[in-house]
Amino acid sequence: MCSAGQLLGGGGGGGGSGGERDEDRDALAERAAAGTEQESGASPRRRGRRPLEEREQDIEESQNHTGEPVGDDYKKMGTLFGELNKSLLNMGFTRMYFGEQIVEPVIVIFFWVMLWFLGLPAFGLVALLCLVIIYVQQ
């Protein structure tokens, strides 16, 4: 049997020429590999490819803007109220339904705190103001 070097070299015999040819081929292969690495790293746009980080960022952006409704609707209220509302719902508070209007637990707690600090007359005034604003927007 013959080795892979002998098959590639085309010769089966001895001498130092077979070994030298293998070393030359190895050096050429290393230079070629180094050249392709430099080309691919130097200008990825020239070959029609973009770096991996940019491709991942584009994928994330396309997934965020798919046009589908967002499952977590607490983003509408802002981060602080949304997170508080999510925590209250997880603790067992429920949403209150007044006809077509849905009142989130964080709003109910907010009005209870206002009642505690401001008293009944101020609470009634603010509640009336909120109801007027809701019906004027419709």
UniProtKB/Swiss-Prot annotation:
Positions of region (Disordered): 1-73
GO cellular component, one term: membrane
Subcellular location(s) per record: Membrane
Gly residues compositional bias, start-end: 7-18
Pfam families membership: DUF4605
Protein origin, superkingdom: Eukaryota
Recorded family membership: Belongs to the FAM241 family.
UniProt-recorded name of the protein: Uncharacterized protein FAM241A
Origin species: Bos taurus
